[in-house]
């Protein structure tokens, strides 16, 4: 039952983001922008694609629609679909960026995989946990995002997140 409640809470947060992003675009914004905790400015632009229809004749006839370039009209549906995952990915990237800056050993990052020497993993794991705790202990990123998009409604409550619990947890990130 609590897993279902948590899942519904996640859906509600995503729906809130979609609603506020749609309002921002409808009010005339051409892009959605926010700054991550590590200082990276995300500027999300989506435009409706210009589509050309072509007919192919090869072992029969085939009609295709091909996107050839971005148009000039903002694509509200792509913004709605992309903003929540992009916000989460930007927070993940910020966490990694800030953690890696504190890690003075050899490291490689490929997408969301972290590669380091085995002998350094305990140190890296501790740094990532501490960075996570510092990032999320006293800051509500949905409230900050609400300011960036000029939200008309309050963001949903994050819930009972206790970031300090990651310090002692068996599994976290790495």
Please identify what each model-predicted range represents.
Residues 16-108, 115-174:
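C-terminal structured domains
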């Amino acid at each position: 039952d609590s897993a279902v409640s948590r899942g519904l809470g996640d859906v509600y947060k995503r729906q809130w983001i979609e609603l506020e992003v749609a309002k921002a675009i409808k009010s005339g914004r051409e892009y959605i922008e926010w700054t991550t905790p590590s200082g990276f400015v995300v500027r999300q632009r989506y435009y409706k694609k210009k589509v050309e229809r072509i007919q192919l004749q090869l072992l029969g006839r085939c009609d295709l629609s091909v996107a050839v370039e971005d148009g000039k009209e903002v694509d509200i549906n792509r913004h709605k679909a992309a903003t929540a995952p992009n916000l989460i990915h930007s927070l993940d990237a910020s966490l990694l960026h800030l953690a890696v800056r504190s890690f003075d050993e050899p490291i490689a990052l490929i997408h969301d995989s972290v590669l380091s020497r085995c002998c350094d993993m305990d140190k890296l794991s501790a740094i990532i946990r501490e960075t996570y705790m510092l990032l999320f202990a006293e800051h509500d990123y949905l409230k900050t995002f609400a300011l960036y998009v000029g939200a008309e409604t309050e963001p949903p409550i994050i819930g009972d997140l206790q970031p300090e619990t990651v310090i002692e947890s068996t599994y976290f990130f790495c």
